UniProtKB/Swiss-Prot annotation:
The modification Phosphoserine is found at S341. The gene is GHR. The modification Phosphotyrosine is found at Y487, Y595. This is Growth hormone receptor. It comes from Saimiri boliviensis boliviensis. Residues 289-632 are cytoplasmic.
């Protein structure tokens, strides 16, 4: 440096005679100095540079060393000696004593080495540099903070596998820990960082820190050469040590073809051509199936087609011509569905509870006060009646037939009953020649009733005036009370919709018990004519005559069980007839017809029943209450 300054001074002194004035000399000197600084930046105008600490490190956490820079002095005067002093910050010692560096040689030039005797791991240190009696630099630290391990040694690699294409390969890199680091005893725990790159590259690829001394490298090119290096640091520390020596990795070429370039699949071209092909196929399919797809997406509106009718007539709205064509052809007449079965329902009037007891069939048969009302023939539009399911034309036909039947029955029935009674009496008089013809007037009315019952034609209940007369005749003669049929309950409903009633009892000929006990007859008649539908058990027992002196083997006394307290009027009538029949031998047994089904519902208060040819066997009905029910 001094030589350059001397040459510069001589040059300036020699050129001072060529230039006049100080200003010119100063300008020349500044230009020369800038030229020299551009050539050699180390030539500065400052006279000196103070020494500084560069770093302090402990490679194995047992010893440490510190280094500093050399002092630079550009003046003519040489710098003084550089000394290092240290002290420990011990809290037990009251004063701090500065001591000079124990070894300036072991760690090299411009360094101080502290062996294990002067090293304390958990005690902080303070160091300073002095020159010519003054402090140049100062620093404080602890040994565990300056740990920087030595580089790992013995790096090598192992081939793991090569890809099927022979382009890439995987390797395993191994190394050993620094020899001076006590890893086996656990005095130090090191973390390793591996870096690798291709030979021609400048940027290193770093891997995550690991605790093991081996790491795999994947997908390395076979035709490339790689550089690998490793460094370490104390765990939980930020200061890495020096890098190890560089390991060069050259992978062998296993395949016969050269791997100068990567073999890439043309995925982009494959995708483009694939989409194009699918689009073309879709358009071809749509074009070939155009009509069918149109039918599926937009189905045509069906045109009304009738055989023998031009569809244009329907489109133009000429309905009169269409109706004319339909009227000509009988095949186009509307067909009624005959498969639908009509169900007949009995009208029930549940508005007034008192009317239920007044409209019983038995009371209508026995009562003469009930007169037919023409106003009852009106149709009641209810959900439970016939009007809810019958057609209006059918309804008018039924009512017209009922009106004609009611009108004729009022005039013809009395004459028919009287004529048949006369014929019956005359027949008995001619055959028997007995004095019974005197009693014909007495039995005239019951015979007429039996003859009328034996006819298979339907019986009109509460529909004509003759029925009321027959009921009045029966009430005038007590012996005819047993011939009355009591329809106790509905037993079944046929599939056709008819209602089947429970059967009645047979009428045994001969003298009845009513003739033997007239007071019982009058009492029972009074009880039966009662408007109430229920009568007491005690009254029912009064109707049964007591015959203690007559013993008949086939006779069985009726018993009223305490559990079955209800008895029916049929059982009561049968019980009242049996004492007489046991005492007298029956002369003839005439069956009383049982009207077991409803023929026509004439009006809300009238029923026409069907008569059966043969009587059904007797049935015993057990009831379970203390009142006798007189039902329809």
């Amino acid at each position: 440096m001094d030589l350059w300054q001397l040459l510069l001074t001589l040059a300036l002194a020699g050129s001072s005679d060529a230039f006049s004035g100080r200003e010119t000399t100063a300008a020349v000197l500044s230009r020369v100095s800038q030229s020299l600084l551009s050539v050699n930046p180390g030539l500065k105008t400052n006279s000196s540079k103070e020494p500084k600490f560069t770093k302090c490190r402990s490679p194995e956490l047992e010893t440490f060393s510190c280094r500093w820079t050399d002092a630079v002095h550009h003046g003519l005067k040489s710098p003084g000696p550089i000394q290092l002093f240290y002290t420990r910050r011990n809290t037990q010692e009251g004063t701090q004593e500065w001591k000079e560096c124990p070894d300036y040689v072991s760690a090299g030039e411009n360094s101080c080495y502290f062996n294990s005797s002067f090293t304390s791991i958990w005690i902080p240190y303070c160091i300073k540099l002095t020159s010519n009696g003054g402090t140049v630099d100062e620093k404080c630290f602890s040994v565990d903070q300056i740990v920087q391990p030595d580089p790992p040694i013995a790096l090598n690699w192992t081939l793991l596998n090569i890809s099927l294409t022979g382009v890439h390969a995987d390797i395993q890199v191994r190394w050993e820990a620094p020899p001076n680091a006590d890893i086996q005893k656990g005095w130090m725990v090191l973390e390793y960082e591996l870096q690798y790159k291709e030979v021609n590259e400048t940027q290193w690829k770093m891997m995550d820190p690991i605790l093991s001394t081996s790491v795999p490298l994947y997908s390395l090119r076979v035709d490339k050469e790689y550089e690998v290096r490793v460094r370490s640091r104390q765990r939980k520390s930020e200061n890495y040590g020096e890098f190890s020596e560089v390991l060069y990795v050259k992978l062998p070429q296993m395949s016969q073809f050269t791997c100068e370039e990567d073999f890439y699949y043309p995925w982009l071209l494959i995708i483009i051509f694939g989409i194009s092909g699918l689009t073309v196929m879709l358009f071809v399919f749509l074009f070939s199936k155009q009509q069918r797809i149109k039918m599926l997406i937009l189905p045509p509106v069906p045109v009304p087609k009738i055989k023998g009718i031009d569809p244009d007539l329907l489109k133009e709205g000429k309905l009169e011509e269409v109706n004319t064509i339909l009227a000509i052809h009988d095949s186009y007449k509307p067909e009624f569905h005959s498969d639908d079965s009509w169900v007949e329902f009995i009208e029930l009037d549940i508005e007034d509870p008192d009317e239920k007891t007044e409209g019983l069939d038995t009371d209508r048969l026995l009562s003469s006060d009930h007169e037919k009302s023409r106003s009852n023939l009106g149709v009641k539009d209810g959900d439970s009646g016939r009007t809810s399911c019958y057609e209006p034309d059918m309804l008018e036909t039924d009512f017209n037939a009922n009106d004609i039947h009611d009108g004729t029955s009022e005039v013809v029935q009395p004459q028919r009953l009287k004529g048949e009674a006369d014929l019956l009496c005359l027949d008995q008089k001619n055959q028997n020649n007995s004095p019974y013809h005197d009693a014909c007037p007495a039995i005239h009315q019951p015979s007429v009733i039996q003859a009328e019952k034996n006819k298979p034609q339907p019986l009109l209940i509460d529909g004509a005036e003759s029925t009321h007369q027959a009921a009045h005749i029966q009430l005038s003669n007590p012996s005819s009370l047993a011939n009355i049929d009591f329809y106790a309950q509905v037993s079944d409903i046929t599939p056709a919709g008819s209602v089947v009633l429970s059967p009645g009892q047979k009428n045994n000929g001969g003298m009845s018990q009513w003739d033997m006990h007239p007071e019982v007859v009058s009492l029972c008649q009074a009880n039966f004519i009662m408007d109430n539908a229920y009568f007491c058990e005690a009254d029912a027992k009064k109707c049964i005559p007591v015959t203690p002196h007559i013993k008949v083997e086939s006779h069985t006394e009726p018993s009223f069980n305490q559990e079955d307290i209800y008895i029916t009027t049929e059982s009561l009538t049968t019980t009242a007839r049996r004492p007489g029949t046991a005492e007298h031998v029956p002369g003839s047994e005439m069956p009383v017809p049982d009207y077991t089904s409803i023929h026509i519902v004439q009006s809300p208060q009238g029923l026409i029943l069907n008569a059966t040819a043969l009587p059904l066997p007797d049935k015993e009905f057990l009831s379970s209450c203390g009142y006798v029910a007189q039902t329809n």
